[in-house]
Amino acid sequence: MNQLRGRFAPTPSGELHLGNLYVALLSWLQVRQGGGQFILRMEDIDRPRSRNELVGPMMDDLHWLGLDWDEGPDQGGENGPYYQSKRLHLYEEALHNLQQQQLLYHCYCSRAELQAVASAPHGVASEGQAYPGTCKKLTAAERAAKAAKKTPSLRFAVDKGPTAEKMDVEMEKLLRRGGDFVVQRADGIISYQLAVVVDDALMGITDVLRGQDLYDSTPRQLLLYAALGYTAPRFVHVPLLYGPDGRRLAKRHRDLSLAAIRANGCRPENIVGLLAALSGLIERPEPLTAAELIPEFRLEKLTTEPILLDTHLLQLLN
């Protein structure tokens, strides 16, 4: 059996917040409890959104919390580079592979045009409107006319894809409901769906623990794993954290960033203990180091309900 390998792959577009740390901690615990290797990767493929100056502070925050990694941007490893922006040649090879199998086609639709298609069914939550197949039905003449005016994106033809392992009935429904999906944007940027599959496969990731918001992406990724001849990892999706305003934790919750919490004098043990209690690993919040929590980790202990960080809970961080 292959050694367990997990990862945490943040986008360096803002400071880490408690929601990011929740996923990072649980993923790290899963790997360390299983005696595996933990990889840190920066998902900076969308260069306009990414800020290199945030990578160092992100790693400092994770170390401060008590997390470490066996491979990553700061120490390298045999599966690098650990920045997506330095792995573009690998994504191009994957695109070529899919094109050779005739699984991709050019799409000239804009986001506005897709939103205007009232008959389109509800799509995939992480990607927006479902694609109605407009450009898949173009004649050669129509395609040539559009190509003369606009650079296309590349879409994966779902109905031509292979049978994917680990896909249950619910995932099959999600896959069909979302329609054909983009693997390369018109501006040349590789999609998250393709990049994350290539990275996880080539880095030998066996287990992916991530937020529930990415569940909808899983069937598309399973399809790409199958099409590229890769073995898919095991996926676990954990509930999201919500701020006192009832909205999912995001960069707008600046007072819940780790930088802000650290600046207020909070100890890492308090954060770890609170996140452990919220996850269901321990009964009530108590100061703990990340290492002390390793024996407590069991997937079956993890809560399946969304988590609200109310004012009372946040006071425990003071």
Swiss-Prot record:
Record's cofactor remark: Binds 1 zinc ion per subunit.
Locus of motif 'HIGH' region: 10-20
MF GO annotations: ATP binding; glutamate-tRNA ligase activity; zinc ion binding
UniProt xrefs under Gene3D superfamilies: HUPs
Binding site for ATP: 251
InterPro entries in the record: aa-tRNA-synth_I_CS (IPR001412), Glu-Q_tRNA(Asp)_Synthase (IPR022380), Glu/Gln-tRNA-synth (IPR000924), Glu/Gln-tRNA-synth_Ib_cat-dom (IPR020058), GluQ/Sye (IPR049940), Rossmann-like_a/b/a_fold (IPR014729)
Cofactor(s) named in the record: Zn(2+)
A GO cellular component entry from the record: cytosol
Positions of L-glutamate binding: 7-11, 43, 192, 210
EC main group: ligase
Keyword Nucleotide-binding included in the entry's annotation: yes
GO biological process, any: glutamyl-tRNA aminoacylation
Keyword Ligase: yes
Motif ('KMSKS' region): 248-252
Pfam families, sorted: tRNA-synt_1c (PF00749)
Keywords, in A-Z order: Aminoacyl-tRNA synthetase, ATP-binding, Ligase, Metal-binding, Nucleotide-binding, Zinc
Positions bound to Zn(2+): 107, 109, 131, 135
Coiled coil: none
Enzyme nomenclature, EC number: 6.1.1.-
Protein family according to the UniProt entry: Belongs to the class-I aminoacyl-tRNA synthetase family. GluQ subfamily.
Function comment: Catalyzes the tRNA-independent activation of glutamate in presence of ATP and the subsequent transfer of glutamate onto a tRNA(Asp). Glutamate is transferred on the 2-amino-5-(4,5-dihydroxy-2-cyclopenten-1-yl) moiety of the queuosine in the wobble position of the QUC anticodon.
Protein name: Glutamyl-Q tRNA(Asp) synthetase
